[in-house]
Amino acid sequence: HINQEIESSLSGVRTAKAFANEAVEAARFDAANAEFKTSKRAFHKAMGMFHSSVEFFLCSLNVIIIGFGGYYVMQGEMDYRDLLTFSLYISSFISPMRKLANFSETFANGFAGLNRFVEVMRTEPTVQDKPDAKELKNVRGEIRVDHVSFAYDADLAVLHDVSLTVAPGETVAIVGPSGGGKSTLCQLIPRFYDVSSGSISIDALDIRDVTQRSIHENIGIVQQDVFLFADTILENIRYGKPDATIEQVIDAAKKAEIYDDIQAMPDGFNTYVGERGTLLSGGQKQRIAIARIFLKNPPILILDEATSALDSVTEAKIQHAFDKLAAGRTTLIIAHRLSTIRNADRIISISDGVITECGTHDELLRKGGIYAELYKTQNALALEALGQ
């Protein structure tokens, strides 16, 4: 618990400073530390009693041997050489006993860690491949969602009887209010979760009948929450294709409009990004994630608010690159900025876990439904911002 508290405090140090909550974090740490000290005090008290008892026994053993042995030597019932030999034997016995006592504390600490490790290792993944699962090969990119319902638990249904077919090479945008089920739908396609009912297939193969690895190899995902490893920019981009050459990495960086930023850094592609990319801006982290997808070059793309952290200028720059990347690939785009998806082949509106509308940008505007309302609201806000 204390280690989690320290990690949380250090990871959120900027947030704590921004809200002037240093005192709150200090109080949380003091509480966690007090709990840690209480548990450790009981442990060390028990170990202290144990070590003291062992030492008392071992020291008493020598005293008893010398006392009784000396008495018997004086009485002539024992030869002094026998007493000396016996004392040496006992001394050789005492040293291993001390080591065993010291080992017991190390063992107690290690055993607690081992129990936690075994508990994690014995946890079975909720999504598993079938014994006879096939490999997904030569993917064209047809996605079929057939009467899919999904709930994270029995009381929290997210999707209700959703059906959708995406043709190979088609670009489909998914919009709707927050919490409507857009991201959940896109997490079901790579089989991060199993559907509660219905089925999802890629190229007419149910994703439950193919290996998860082959699914993930053919799908590229850029999410809102970008995760970067504590490594260099080069290795973070190369994560999309571990055997990529430096030339391929540079090309991907250029397409993602991050190359100039990298070149401006003192160490270029060898720049260390810090834990979770803390040394980079939000836009830079997102563009590195986009560069990974350019490098991976999959037949299916899922862009979950992929440009949410980009400014308007940079977003406009990479929009053309996205159009080139999406050409000939099946692409699903989750977007709140509706201006970025006007050119999608189809736009689907999801609200409360149900598909409410489907059509092109112009068709949905003419319908005057949820999409039209969202579009008008965003336009009004944009005009208001310009007026100010």
Task: Give residue ranges: language-model regions.
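ABC-type nucleotide-binding domain
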Residues: 129-130, 134-388
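HisKA/DHp dimerization-phosphotransfer core of two-component histidine kinases
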Residues: 1, 8, 59, 99, ...
